Regions:
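Active-site-adjacent structural elements that line small-molecule/cofactor binding pockets in enzymes
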Residues: 1-309
């Protein structure tokens, strides 16, 4: 059996376990990078007390380093799963990525999920690298990860891939537990599940604003969306789904904003989460966009948790 086939078989066996472990709804946030570490520790304890089982953290230019950040948050919590959404493959070589994951899963069994992704051309350029053939590059990177030397205890690091298009989704099914799509409307979840098949894990990010005021909610949504609409991977994915250039312009049409970011009361947010589940998602990680940036980042989650959990 080849390494790739073996990983796929193992992934199918483990994906259902991880779907249950993550729970139906988790949290995705970059807010913690803006807080002192002491406040981030308090945040993860608050998430646990609310009943969430998983927290997804990002990694970008200027953010905390993914493995160090995950280690801090794992140490501060008792049961919470910390997932990287995602760790950038351009930020470290494949050996460092593999062994960072092995270290954390050894220290915190069943509580660390390694999400990795190919990033975006502008970010890669700033790192002095050239972005090209992302699927092929990811495949080669995974080969190098799987062959990485390690003198510590033999442990298997559970991983998912950031995936939007069909080829990366299929690679997620072949070489990982599954996929972590980001910045997608619900129709993408249907497509993702079809490409993955029934076994692999599908963990979808969903942005949300807890506000009934259309002007306030859409303003918060557009602040969030602007940077992503300027990135080809996200823009091209939306075009592939049938959205026009006019929809993508000026922070997004109202129709696109409402498709990418759910807003309203906690019931409206739960309805969007339920639609992702109906279309094949195992886990939906809510990224709650704050309308009051001075308020604690967990305030809105308290209201949402009462409905979605």
């Amino acid at each position: 059996m080849s390494a790739a086939v073996g990983i796929a078989a193992t992934g199918r066996g483990k994906a259902r376990e991880w779907a249950k472990r993550l729970g139906a709804v988790g949290v995705w946030t970059i807010d913690l990078d803006r807080l002192p570490v002491a406040a981030a520790r308090e945040y993860v304890r608050a998430l646990e007390s609310l009943g969430f089982q998983a927290l997804w953290i990002g990694e970008g230019l200027g953010s905390r380093e993914a493995f160090a950040n995950a280690g801090v948050l794992l140490a501060a919590s008792q049961r919470l799963i910390i997932a990287t959404g995602i760790a950038n493959i351009w930020a470290r070589d494949a050996i460092a990525m593999a062994n960072g994951g092995r270290t954390l899963i050894d220290a915190y069994p069943d509580r660390f999920l390694l999400g990795i992704g190919v990033s975006h051309a502008p970010t890669v350029k700033l790192r002095g690298e050239t972005y090209a053939k992302p699927v092929e590059h990811m495949r080669e990177y995974l080969d190098a990860m799987d062959g990485a030397p390690y003198v510590g205890p033999k442990v298997e690091t559970p991983r998912v891939l950031a995936a939007l298009g069909p080829r990366m989704l299929r690679l997620s099914a072949e070489r990982a537990l599954g996929a972590h799509p980001y910045f997608v409307p619900v129709e993408h979840t249907t497509i993702a599940r079809k490409e993955l098949g029934e076994g692999p894990l599908l963990a979808v990010e969903q942005a949300a604003v807890l506000s009934d005021d259309p002007a306030v909610a859409r303003a918060a949504a557009r602040r969030y969306m602007k940077r992503y609409l300027d990135l080809d991977n996200y823009a091209n994915n939306l075009r592939r789904l049938g959205w026009s250039d006019a929809d993508l312009a000026a922070g997004g049409s109202d129709k696109l904003v409402d498709a990418i970011v759910v807003w309203g009361d906690a019931g409206a947010i739960q309805s969007r989460v339920a639609e992702h589940h109906e279309r094949g998602a195992d886990h939906v990680c809510l990224q709650v966009l704050r309308t009051d940036l001075a308020a604690p980042p967990s305030r809105e989650l308290e209201a949402i948790a009462k409905v979605v959990l």
